[in-house]
Protein backbone atom coordinates (compact mmCIF):
# COMPACT_ATOMS: atom_id res chain seq x y z
CA UNK A 1 0.00 0.00 0.00
CA UNK A 2 1.41 3.34 -1.01
CA UNK A 3 2.31 5.82 1.75
CA UNK A 4 1.73 8.82 -0.50
CA UNK A 5 -1.07 11.02 0.80
CA UNK A 6 -3.65 12.31 -1.60
CA UNK A 7 -4.23 16.09 -1.69
CA UNK A 8 -7.11 17.36 0.41
CA UNK A 9 -9.28 20.22 -0.79
CA UNK A 10 -10.48 22.69 1.82
CA UNK A 11 -13.46 24.95 1.32
CA UNK A 12 -12.98 28.63 2.18
CA UNK A 13 -15.95 30.97 2.43
CA UNK A 14 -15.84 34.29 0.63
CA UNK A 15 -16.50 35.98 3.96
CA UNK A 16 -13.28 34.53 5.36
CA UNK A 17 -11.29 36.01 2.49
CA UNK A 18 -12.94 39.41 2.75
CA UNK A 19 -12.28 39.60 6.47
CA UNK A 20 -8.57 38.90 6.20
CA UNK A 21 -6.45 41.90 7.17
CA UNK A 22 -3.80 41.73 4.44
CA UNK A 23 -2.00 44.14 2.20
CA UNK A 24 -1.15 43.23 -1.38
CA UNK A 25 2.37 44.62 -0.89
CA UNK A 26 3.21 41.73 1.43
CA UNK A 27 2.53 39.26 -1.35
CA UNK A 28 4.11 41.13 -4.25
CA UNK A 29 5.48 38.46 -6.63
CA UNK A 30 7.99 40.97 -8.03
CA UNK A 31 9.63 41.46 -4.61
CA UNK A 32 13.33 42.08 -5.19
CA UNK A 33 14.45 43.15 -1.72
CA UNK A 34 15.90 40.09 0.01
CA UNK A 35 16.18 41.74 3.44
CA UNK A 36 12.78 43.40 3.57
CA UNK A 37 11.46 42.74 7.09
CA UNK A 38 8.01 41.48 7.90
CA UNK A 39 5.76 44.44 8.59
CA UNK A 40 5.30 44.92 12.34
CA UNK A 41 2.02 45.18 14.13
CA UNK A 42 0.66 48.76 14.14
CA UNK A 43 1.77 50.79 17.11
CA UNK A 44 1.07 54.41 16.23
CA UNK A 45 -1.39 56.04 13.86
CA UNK A 46 -1.32 59.77 13.28
CA UNK A 47 -4.49 61.56 12.22
CA UNK A 48 -4.05 64.52 9.88
CA UNK A 49 -7.68 65.52 10.28
CA UNK A 50 -7.89 66.44 13.94
CA UNK A 51 -9.53 69.82 13.33
CA UNK A 52 -12.16 69.21 10.60
CA UNK A 53 -14.56 66.31 10.59
CA UNK A 54 -12.88 63.00 9.80
CA UNK A 55 -15.45 62.06 7.13
CA UNK A 56 -16.71 65.24 5.41
CA UNK A 57 -19.78 64.98 3.17
CA UNK A 58 -20.69 61.63 4.73
CA UNK A 59 -23.85 61.39 6.89
CA UNK A 60 -22.86 61.55 10.53
CA UNK A 61 -25.28 58.81 11.48
CA UNK A 62 -23.32 56.34 9.35
CA UNK A 63 -19.74 57.13 10.31
CA UNK A 64 -18.52 58.40 13.66
CA UNK A 65 -15.06 59.95 14.06
CA UNK A 66 -12.63 58.33 16.49
CA UNK A 67 -13.19 59.27 20.13
CA UNK A 68 -11.35 62.36 21.36
CA UNK A 69 -9.80 60.53 24.28
CA UNK A 70 -7.79 58.40 21.84
CA UNK A 71 -5.79 61.37 20.63
CA UNK A 72 -2.72 62.79 22.29
CA UNK A 73 0.24 65.02 21.54
CA UNK A 74 0.65 65.92 17.84
CA UNK A 75 -2.57 64.15 16.87
CA UNK A 76 -1.17 60.67 17.55
CA UNK A 77 -3.75 57.97 18.11
CA UNK A 78 -3.52 54.48 19.49
CA UNK A 79 -5.15 52.11 16.96
CA UNK A 80 -6.11 49.78 19.80
CA UNK A 81 -8.59 52.43 20.95
CA UNK A 82 -10.63 52.15 17.73
CA UNK A 83 -13.84 50.16 17.77
CA UNK A 84 -14.39 47.21 15.44
CA UNK A 85 -16.81 49.33 13.40
CA UNK A 86 -14.22 52.07 12.99
CA UNK A 87 -11.59 49.53 11.92
CA UNK A 88 -13.95 48.21 9.24
CA UNK A 89 -14.47 51.76 8.01
CA UNK A 90 -10.71 52.38 7.84
CA UNK A 91 -10.32 49.23 5.72
CA UNK A 92 -12.23 51.06 2.97
CA UNK A 93 -9.49 53.70 2.70
CA UNK A 94 -7.12 53.67 -0.29
CA UNK A 95 -3.53 52.77 0.68
CA UNK A 96 -0.75 54.89 -0.84
CA UNK A 97 2.98 54.27 -0.40
CA UNK A 98 5.74 56.81 -1.17
CA UNK A 99 7.44 54.43 -3.63
CA UNK A 100 4.43 54.86 -5.96
CA UNK A 101 5.94 58.26 -6.88
CA UNK A 102 9.68 57.40 -6.87
CA UNK A 103 11.40 58.54 -10.07
CA UNK A 104 14.22 56.03 -9.55
CA UNK A 105 11.89 53.03 -9.73
CA UNK A 106 10.30 51.18 -12.58
CA UNK A 107 6.68 50.08 -12.52
CA UNK A 108 7.85 46.59 -11.60
CA UNK A 109 9.74 48.08 -8.65
CA UNK A 110 6.67 49.84 -7.28
CA UNK A 111 6.16 53.10 -9.20
CA UNK A 112 2.48 53.78 -10.02
CA UNK A 113 2.67 57.10 -11.90
CA UNK A 114 4.34 57.95 -15.21
CA UNK A 115 8.04 58.74 -15.09
CA UNK A 116 7.45 62.40 -15.98
CA UNK A 117 5.27 62.80 -12.87
CA UNK A 118 7.57 60.95 -10.47
CA UNK A 119 9.85 62.78 -8.01
CA UNK A 120 12.99 62.29 -5.96
CA UNK A 121 12.72 61.20 -2.31
CA UNK A 122 8.92 61.00 -1.91
CA UNK A 123 7.74 60.95 1.72
CA UNK A 124 4.48 59.79 3.28
CA UNK A 125 4.15 63.05 5.22
CA UNK A 126 4.07 65.09 2.00
CA UNK A 127 1.53 62.71 0.45
CA UNK A 128 -0.61 63.18 3.55
CA UNK A 129 -0.36 66.97 3.19
CA UNK A 130 -1.48 66.66 -0.45
CA UNK A 131 -4.56 64.68 0.56
CA UNK A 132 -5.42 67.22 3.22
CA UNK A 133 -5.13 70.00 0.64
CA UNK A 134 -7.68 68.10 -1.47
CA UNK A 135 -10.08 67.95 1.47
CA UNK A 136 -9.94 64.17 1.78
CA UNK A 137 -10.11 62.17 5.03
CA UNK A 138 -6.59 60.85 5.56
CA UNK A 139 -4.52 58.90 8.05
CA UNK A 140 -0.74 58.87 8.18
CA UNK A 141 0.58 55.55 9.47
CA UNK A 142 4.19 56.10 10.43
CA UNK A 143 5.09 52.47 11.12
CA UNK A 144 3.84 50.89 7.88
CA UNK A 145 6.42 50.12 5.21
CA UNK A 146 6.33 48.78 1.67
CA UNK A 147 8.59 45.69 1.51
CA UNK A 148 10.44 47.07 -1.51
CA UNK A 149 11.01 50.42 0.23
CA UNK A 150 11.89 49.23 3.73
CA UNK A 151 14.12 52.24 4.48
CA UNK A 152 11.33 54.78 3.90
CA UNK A 153 8.66 54.03 6.53
CA UNK A 154 5.22 55.57 6.41
CA UNK A 155 2.12 55.19 4.31
CA UNK A 156 -1.14 57.06 3.80
CA UNK A 157 -4.71 55.78 3.96
CA UNK A 158 -7.11 58.13 2.19
CA UNK A 159 -10.81 58.04 1.40
CA UNK A 160 -11.73 59.67 -1.92
CA UNK A 161 -15.02 57.84 -2.43
CA UNK A 162 -17.70 57.91 0.25
CA UNK A 163 -18.19 54.15 0.28
CA UNK A 164 -20.79 54.56 3.01
CA UNK A 165 -22.82 56.94 0.83
CA UNK A 166 -23.26 54.88 -2.37
CA UNK A 167 -19.72 55.65 -3.55
CA UNK A 168 -20.28 59.39 -3.80
CA UNK A 169 -17.07 61.24 -4.67
CA UNK A 170 -15.81 63.41 -1.83
CA UNK A 171 -13.97 65.65 -4.29
CA UNK A 172 -15.77 65.78 -7.68
CA UNK A 173 -12.47 66.46 -9.47
CA UNK A 174 -11.08 63.09 -8.39
CA UNK A 175 -13.02 60.64 -10.53
CA UNK A 176 -10.54 57.74 -10.40
CA UNK A 177 -7.56 56.52 -8.41
CA UNK A 178 -5.26 57.40 -11.33
CA UNK A 179 -6.44 61.01 -11.23
CA UNK A 180 -5.86 61.05 -7.47
CA UNK A 181 -2.30 59.76 -7.91
CA UNK A 182 -1.56 62.34 -10.62
CA UNK A 183 -2.80 65.22 -8.46
CA UNK A 184 -0.71 63.98 -5.53
CA UNK A 185 2.30 63.75 -7.86
CA UNK A 186 1.82 67.39 -8.87
CA UNK A 187 1.79 68.41 -5.21
CA UNK A 188 4.98 66.42 -4.56
CA UNK A 189 6.65 68.14 -7.51
CA UNK A 190 5.66 71.56 -6.14
CA UNK A 191 6.88 70.64 -2.64
CA UNK A 192 10.20 68.81 -3.16
CA UNK A 193 11.71 66.88 -0.29
CA UNK A 194 14.53 68.63 1.57
CA UNK A 195 16.24 68.03 4.89
CA UNK A 196 13.72 70.44 6.43
CA UNK A 197 11.00 67.95 5.43
CA UNK A 198 12.26 65.58 8.11
CA UNK A 199 13.18 68.24 10.65
CA UNK A 200 11.21 69.43 13.70
CA UNK A 201 8.79 71.44 11.53
CA UNK A 202 7.49 68.25 9.92
CA UNK A 203 5.36 67.57 13.00
CA UNK A 204 6.50 63.95 13.20
CA UNK A 205 7.52 62.98 16.75
CA UNK A 206 11.20 62.21 17.18
CA UNK A 207 12.48 59.00 18.76
CA UNK A 208 13.91 59.62 22.25
CA UNK A 209 17.49 59.10 21.04
CA UNK A 210 17.05 61.98 18.57
CA UNK A 211 15.40 64.51 20.89
CA UNK A 212 18.55 66.54 21.53
CA UNK A 213 20.91 68.10 18.99
CA UNK A 214 20.06 65.86 16.06
CA UNK A 215 20.81 67.28 12.63
CA UNK A 216 19.23 65.41 9.69
CA UNK A 217 21.60 64.44 6.89
CA UNK A 218 21.33 62.81 3.51
CA UNK A 219 22.29 59.16 3.50
CA UNK A 220 24.59 57.56 0.94
CA UNK A 221 22.96 55.21 -1.51
CA UNK A 222 23.76 51.52 -1.29
CA UNK A 223 24.71 49.96 -4.60
CA UNK A 224 22.03 47.61 -5.87
CA UNK A 225 19.13 49.09 -3.87
CA UNK A 226 16.44 51.60 -4.78
CA UNK A 227 16.30 53.97 -1.84
CA UNK A 228 15.79 57.57 -0.77
CA UNK A 229 18.71 59.74 0.18
CA UNK A 230 16.35 61.59 2.56
CA UNK A 231 14.35 59.31 4.84
CA UNK A 232 12.07 59.92 7.85
CA UNK A 233 13.83 60.38 11.14
CA UNK A 234 12.43 57.08 12.49
CA UNK A 235 13.87 55.10 9.55
CA UNK A 236 16.43 52.43 10.36
CA UNK A 237 18.59 53.92 7.61
CA UNK A 238 18.84 57.31 9.31
CA UNK A 239 22.44 58.34 9.90
CA UNK A 240 23.48 57.80 13.52
CA UNK A 241 20.50 55.51 14.12
CA UNK A 242 21.58 53.06 16.87
CA UNK A 243 20.56 50.05 14.76
CA UNK A 244 22.49 50.98 11.62
CA UNK A 245 25.05 53.55 12.72
CA UNK A 246 27.90 51.07 12.30
CA UNK A 247 27.10 50.72 8.59
CA UNK A 248 28.21 54.29 7.90
CA UNK A 249 31.07 54.50 10.41
CA UNK A 250 34.49 54.47 8.75
CA UNK A 251 36.43 51.32 9.34
CA UNK A 252 39.26 51.81 11.84
CA UNK A 253 42.71 51.73 10.37
CA UNK A 254 44.50 48.54 11.23
CA UNK A 255 48.13 49.13 12.27
CA UNK A 256 50.67 47.50 10.05
CA UNK A 257 51.77 44.25 11.53
CA UNK A 258 55.36 44.67 12.75
CA UNK A 259 57.93 42.07 12.00
CA UNK A 260 58.93 39.99 15.01
CA UNK A 261 62.24 41.01 16.53
CA UNK A 262 64.17 37.86 15.78
CA UNK A 263 67.98 37.98 15.72
CA UNK A 264 69.51 37.28 12.36
CA UNK A 265 71.16 33.95 11.93
CA UNK A 266 74.80 34.51 10.98
CA UNK A 267 75.81 33.16 7.62
CA UNK A 268 78.21 30.29 7.57
CA UNK A 269 81.59 31.23 6.17
CA UNK A 270 83.33 28.59 4.14
CA UNK A 271 87.06 28.94 3.56
CA UNK A 272 88.48 27.17 0.55
CA UNK A 273 92.23 26.43 0.56
CA UNK A 274 93.83 25.78 -2.74
CA UNK A 275 96.78 23.43 -2.77
From Swiss-Prot:
GO molecular function annotations of the record: 7S RNA binding
Which residues fall in a compositionally biased region of kind Polar residues? Answer: 58-74
User: What Gene Ontology cellular-component terms does the record carry?
Assistant: signal recognition particle, endoplasmic reticulum targeting
GO terms classed as biological process: SRP-dependent cotranslational protein targeting to membrane, signal sequence recognition
Its chief place of residence is cytoplasm
Q: Where in the cell is it found?
A: Cytoplasm
Q: Which residues form the signal peptide?
A: none
Annotated region (Disordered), positions in chain: 28-76, 249-275
Fetch the Gene3D superfamilies from UniProt. Answer: Signal recognition particle, SRP19-like subunit
Q: Where are the transmembrane segments?
A: none
Q: Which SUPFAM superfamilies match?
A: SRP19 (SSF69695)
Renumbered to this chain, the Basic residues biased-composition regions fall at 265-275
Is RNA-binding among this UniProt entry's keywords?
A: yes
Pfam short name (any one): SRP19
User: Can you state the subunit structure given in the record?
Assistant: Fungal signal recognition particle consists of a 7S RNA molecule (scR1) and at least six protein subunits: SRP72, SRP68, SRP54, SEC65, SRP21 and SRP14.
Q: What's this protein's family per the entry?
A: Belongs to the SRP19 family.
Q: What is this protein identified as?
A: Signal recognition particle SEC65 subunit
Q: Which organism is it from?
A: Candida albicans (Yeast)
Q: Which gene encodes it?
A: SEC65
Amino acid sequence: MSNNKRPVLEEVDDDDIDNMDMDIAEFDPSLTTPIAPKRPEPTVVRSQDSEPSLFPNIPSNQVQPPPKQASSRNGIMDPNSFTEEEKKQFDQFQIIYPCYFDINRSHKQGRRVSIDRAVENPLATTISDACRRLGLPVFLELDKTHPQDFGNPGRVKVLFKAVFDNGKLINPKLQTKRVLFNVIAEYLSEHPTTLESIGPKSGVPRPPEFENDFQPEEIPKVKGFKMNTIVPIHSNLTLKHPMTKHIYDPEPETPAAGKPNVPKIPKKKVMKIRG
